[in-house]
Amino acid sequence: MALWGGRFEAGVAEVTQEFGASLPVDKHLYKQDITGSKAHAKMLAAQGIISAEDEQAIAEGLTGIEQDIDAGNFTFDINDEDIHMSIESELTRRIGEAGKRLHTGRSRNDQVATDTRLGVKALAKELMEANLQLRHVLMDAAKKYDRVILPGYTHMQHAQPVLLSHHLLAYSWMFARDFTRLKAAFDAADNCPLGAAALAGTSYPLDRQMTAAELGFAGVIPNSLDAVSDRDFLLDLHYAGSVIAMHLSRLSEEIVLWSSSEFGFITLSDSYSTGSSIMPQKKNPDFAELIRGKSGRVYGNLVQLLVTMKGLPLAYNKDLQEDKEGALDTAHTLMQCLSVMAGMISTWTVNEGAMACECGVGHLAATDVADYLAKRGLPFREAHAVVGHLVLMCEKRGCNLEDLPFEVFQEASPLFERDITEALDIPSIVAARTTEGGTAPAAVAVQLGRAEAQLAADEDVFGSLTKVVEMGHGAN
């Protein structure tokens, strides 16, 4: 009989047993559940609600169960319905009456909310670590390619030349903001629901602050209804994950393009490529494509929980059983994606010649030629028109701006002098972008220093995340 079966004369229908069980999913939170139960029992003993002997038996019994699960020696029974019932029933089987006292002053409603919050903290921390590792890889690549120039694009058309290091640092800053969002998700989960019981609190003299401190929470949730009924902290994790997936997808798209025959900017290592079953010549960027594809999966998990939550009245509803699978899937998916992305970048080969060659087409110097005229007194809009006419002439002749004779420039505007060649020189164009955040080598060096400082600060934040109940892997 189920632990809640006293009020019932018959068991649940066979067809609903598996349908209603959450154990296949929430068993992955076994460490969080056991840690929460230990803290609850310790508080019950401190408050004189259970004896010290019972608390010791409970703690030892739970430790034994955890060790068995860690070692893969624990059999989960679907009839136990969820991780809470599974562990409590096994605890009672092992230690007897003391196990039946564990649930005093507690409901599965505040218990599962606690497990989930502890789980979100653990998942956010894992993702933060993977985020830091990828940013290290991007930083190393930015240092390595700090003099390599490639075309910058708008609308996927040649725009202006930029340093490859500048391009890579753009993604580093995106992932730095992702770290901040992950920390915000961690903080959103960092309050303890235990003591809220089913929804209204309890008549037992529980010390909620003690339990929260034991579990490493920053504090307690001040409203018992809110404590058991909302999952906005999970949505914060989903949103942070969705933005990470979007940034990874954008970077993956560029890797797919850059590794193509049409671009040839990079060559992916064999370890991060696949072949074709029919075309012997193929070397496909499958893993970049998979990262791009998995972004939709991560977005779907966010939307699923939003839709699940949108119509729920206070307080707990069984719909909330659907809250964990998507979060676990998103975290697992992103951990893989972040790791694969770091591997791809750290092992690729940059084809500097192909990037330099592509800088010689597409009239990348056009803006600087217009600026040349504007700095000599011609209104920029007029300068823009003059250079636009020169570009049109180049298109008709099948040449680039730097191929035009000096006489053609003078015919277009008497303001052109022989030093126009400097405005047509790609390295000089890049070196001129000295504004803060610009692509000039000097500006990028400053930016790199700031990025390294931000990375170091985020590593300090990560190092401060103590007393986190790490995810267990014995239930896989």
Locate each region found by the language model.
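Glycine-rich cofactor/substrate-binding loops
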Residues: 1-32, 36, 97-98, 279-476
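A short small-residue
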Residues: 41-44, 111-119, 154-156, 224-232, ...
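Conserved hydrophobic residue
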Residues: 50, 74, 263-264, 379, ...
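Conserved helix-loop functional segments at active or binding sites
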Residues: 144-147, 181-184, 188, 217-221, ...
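Acidic, glycine-rich loop-and-beta core segments that form the ion-binding/anion-interacting portion
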Residues: 214-307
